UniProtKB/Swiss-Prot annotation:
Associated pathway: Amino-acid biosynthesis; L-methionine biosynthesis via de novo pathway; L-methionine from L-homocysteine (MetE route): step 1/1
Residues reported in the UniProt entry to bind L-homocysteine: I455, G456, S457, E508, D623
Organism of provenance: Caulobacter vibrioides (strain ATCC 19089 / CIP 103742 / CB 15) (Caulobacter crescentus)
Chain sites annotated for binding 5-methyltetrahydropteroyltri-L-glutamate: R17, E18, L19, K20, K132, R539, C540, W585, E629
MF GO annotations: 5-methyltetrahydropteroyltriglutamate-homocysteine S-methyltransferase activity; zinc ion binding
Cofactors that this protein relies on: Zn(2+)
Protein name: 5-methyltetrahydropteroyltriglutamate--homocysteine methyltransferase
Record-annotated active site: H718 (proton donor)
Keyword list, A-Z: Amino-acid biosynthesis, Metal-binding, Methionine biosynthesis, Methyltransferase, Repeat, Transferase, Zinc
UniProt family annotation: Belongs to the vitamin-B12 independent methionine synthase family.
Residues bound to Zn(2+): H665, C667, E689, C750
Pfam family, one: Meth_synt_1
Length: 777
């Protein structure tokens, strides 16, 4: 008997983003369904055979998806809302993509950031609501269920893919999203209705799927219930027991490997170990301490899947150190009761480090992407089965890399540590309370009531993207690129003056991305060429890799600000990304607490804020688009996170005089549960997304008696639609019913980078007119 290895899921997009390009060609009508399905099949085949060749015994199938695995599950159980016009039978591609992206043929709205949950497809039949998958930057489509919902098995995808792999000689372990998590992720429009109440109706379909898999020859099936990493009620735990009792009964032929990830089981551990399943997966990266408890609490026959390799990050593991922990477990439990695995699906990591030819070799040896993580598992299994000596060279290389990383001067900058140690509480406080600052700012800025502004970026046109690409490839010179960007900036500034905006922006034409742009100028960040990770559907992001102590060698935005301000007498906002957002949209160090890394970034941003002020900026905006999405999965951990997140923002923002106005921006609208933290950030002005909620979400601010100024977005930039003046005056009136007039700003709900100029111009002209009318009324 030997220790085997499993992966819980592998990236779907392809090493060269083949799936993305196939999807987009299909959506654009350039290729047909066969071409798309061929690419998908080819990717699956390569993924299976590659994992099998690397020594994975439990190769997953049905982890592939054309768009999203939660959507696949909804389709599998026939949960297709009436709006999509489905009349039973197999769900065709048109219906599937309508659920994913809204109306056919309509281009997906682009997100404003990797974690932005803005659903594509603005008009026509809307897409299902898209939201973040637990605490990742992956977005799933929330199933929409209604009271009395009927379920029926309407897809043979799990069985088809199992057979497809079997035909290639790979015996897979199919993956299903578990019924309880599926229902917990679902949304409903019916008030007071809980989708979990549909469990009894749903279970028979799962029973059918499991029997189908058994008939096709599957022995193990992986069933994912990551809801076990959340706070659950006693009722929910009881429902899990009921569900797995029923499923074991319905399909006695298959052995279930129950997984949860993104954290420990915590309070749910006793429930999990006692479910009538044959295997249980533990996320030992996020919850290393749960191993002992699980060993002690579980019956001897339960197979434990030990998630020891980090599926959420890019660091190479220290294999000898892991073996020190694993060897006693194997000795105690028996090799046939232990499976080695990544902590979660590898969906959240880039695919292959071998594609990175430009990475600094020193940094590169510290990294492992999906393929390298599987290789590491193979080394671990070999060492456990054949002794450490049988893989001595691989173990030594791993230990060597770990030692090098622990001591590298590239990572450890004593000056950063000293500076951090010298941070005093007054550095996180503005000099005076808001009321006093407001007066100082009023005197300095002299703005009209309901001042108008935008969130920062203007359209990233084809020309802008082409110029950037040409510059990156060395096809155009520094000077040519710079001249081009200056011209774009000058045009944007002149246009803003003409339409009568009160507070201007330079337009962010020089920025590739709101995090990458800063990461590239800060010490401590590295970037990949092919390190793509799926964000949703065909959209992928390449998160920066935060590998070392962060500092700011030189000013990052000051020259652009100076240039832009030199073109106008109106105030030009300095435009920065905040420390929490930079942190949350990067791969972060695993050798330093997140909060320490965040404070380091905060100090670097603070330097920039202070320099902008010294250069003359009267208004500086520090975007924290990703503050909310960093919230931990369990409520009990929220306060600690919010404390250091807010403190980091304040550290970045508080180095300026009272008369300098600090803005922040957040791309979402759910503030109810974090309003105290928003208040504690102590920004002078916050702009938020509200356009789609008819200003109702302002109630959170009203209830909190939020003292400072707010720019509730008066129109949705995620759609090309140009809002009429009246629409925005109505929204402004609704806002004024809730807040004092002098608290309000007028702005769109996010940056305009994904829009085109004609609609942007028309919308802003209307917005300025709406503000004028509102002032007069
Ligand atoms: N200043 C950024 C922009 O306008 C903010 C983007 C965001 O919040 N996602 O593009
Ligand atoms: Zn935004």
């Amino acid at each position: 008997m030997t220790v085997t290895i499993a992966t819980l899921g592998f990236p779907r997009i392809g090493p060269k983003r083949e799936l993305k390009f196939a999807l987009e060609a299909y959506w654009a009508g350039k290729t047909d369904a066969d071409a798309l399905l061929d690419t998908a099949r080819d990717l699956r085949a390569k993924t299976w055979t590659r994992q099998a060749a690397l020594g994975v015994a439990h190769v997953p199938s049905n982890d592939f998806s054309l768009y999203d695995h939660v959507l696949d599950t909804a389709v599998m159980v026939g949960a297709i809302p009436a709006a999509y016009g489905w009349s039973g039978g197999t769900v065709d591609l048109a219906t599937y993509f309508a659920m994913a992206r809204g109306d056919q043929g309509r281009p997906a709205a682009e997100a404003c950031g990797p974690g932005c949950g803005h659903a594509p497809g603005a008009d026509g039949v809307p897409a299902l609501e898209m939201t973040k998958w637990f605490d990742t930057n992956y977005h799933y489509l929330a199933p929409e269920l209604s009271p009395g919902q009927a379920f029926a098995l309407t897809s043979s995808k799990p069985v088809d893919e199992f057979l497809e792999a079997k035909a290639l000689g790979v015996h897979t372990r199919p993956v299903l999203l578990g019924p309880v998590t599926f229902l917990k992720l679902a949304k409903t429009k019916a008030e007071g209705f809980s989708p979990l109440s549909l469990l009894s109706a749903l279970l028979p379909v799962y029973g059918q799927v499991l029997r189908g898999l058994a008939a096709a020859g599957a022995d193990w099936v992986q069933i994912d219930e990551p809801c076990l990493a959340l706070d659950l009620t006693d009722f929910e735990r009881a429902e899990l027991r009921r569900a797995y009792g029923a499923l074991t009964h319905a399909a006695p032929g298959v052995r279930l490997m129950l997984t949860s990830y993104f954290g420990g089981y915590g309070e749910n551990l006793a429930t999990a170990v006692n479910l009538p399943v044959e295997g249980l997966h533990l996320d030992l990266v996020r919850a290393p301490d749960e191993l002992e408890a699980a060993l002690a609490a579980s019956r001897e026959s339960l197979v434990l899947s030990l998630g020891v390799i980090d599926g959420r990050n890019v660091w190479r593991a220290d294999l000898p150190a892991l073996l020190d922990r694993l060897e006693p477990v194997v000795a105690r439990r028996g090799s046939d009761r232990v499976v080695l695995a990544p902590s979660c699906s590898l969906l959240h990591t880039p695919i292959d480090l071998d594609l990175e030819t430009a990475l600094d070799p020193e940094i590169r040896q510290w990294l492992a992407f999906a393929v390298q993580k599987v290789e590491a598992l193979a080394v671990l299994a070999q060492a456990l089965n054949g002794g450490r000596a049988s893989v001595a060279a691989a173990l030594e290389a791993s230990a060597q890399a770990a030692r090098a990383r622990a001591t590298s001067p590239r990572i450890h900058d004593p000056k950063v540590a000293e500076r951090l140690a010298a941070v005093t509480p007054d550095m996180t406080r503005r000099r005076s309370p808001y009321d006093q600052r407001r007066e100082a700012q009023r005197a300095r800025l002299n703005l009209p009531p309901l001042p108008t502004t935008t969130i920062g970026s203007f359209p990233q046109t084809t020309e802008v993207r082409q110029a950037r690409a040409a510059f990156a490839k060395g096809q155009i010179s520094d000077a040519t690129y710079e001249a081009f960007l200056r011209q774009e900036t000058a045009r944007a500034v002149a246009w803003q003056e003409t339409v009568g905006l009160d507070v201007l922006v330079h337009g962010e034409f020089e920025r590739n991305d709101m995090v990458q742009y800063f990461g590239e100028q800060l010490a401590g960040f590295a970037f990949t060429q092919s390190g793509w990770v799926q964000s949703y559907g065909s959209r992928c992001v390449r998160p920066p890799i935060l590998f070392g102590d962060v500092s700011r060698p030189a000013p990052m935005t000051v020259d652009w600000w100076r240039y832009a301000q030199g073109l106008t007498r109106r105030p030009m906002k300095g435009m920065l990304t905040g420390p929490v957002t930079i942190l949350n949209w990067s791969f972060v160090r695993d050798d330093l607490p997140r909060e320490t890394a965040c404070r380091q970034i905060a100090l670097a941003i603070r330097d920039e804020v202070v320099d902008l002020e010294a250069t003359g900026a009267a208004i500086i905006q520090i975007d924290e688009a990703a503050l909310r999405e960093g919230l931990p999965l369990r409520r009990g951990d929220w306060d600690a996170y919010l404390d250091w997140a807010v403190e980091s923002f304040r550290l970045a923002a508080s180095g300026v005089a009272d008369a300098t106005q600090i803005h922040t921006h957040m791309c979402y609208s759910e503030f109810n549960d974090i309003i105290a933290a928003i208040g504690a950030m102590d920004a002078d002005v916050i702009s938020i997304e509200t356009a789609r909620s008819k200003m109702e979400l302002l109630d959170a601010f009203v209830g909190y008696a939020y003292p400072a100024q707010i720019g509730p977005g008066v129109y949705d930039i995620h759609s090309p639609r140009v809002p009429a003046v009246e629409e925005m005056t109505t929204l402004l009136a609704a806002a004024r019913q809730r807040l004092a007039g002098e608290q309000l700003w007028v702005n769109p709900d996010c940056g305009l980078k994904t829009r085109k100029w004609p609609e942007t111009q028309a919308a802003i002209v209307n917005m300025v007119e709406a503000a004028r009318r509102a002032r007069a009324s």
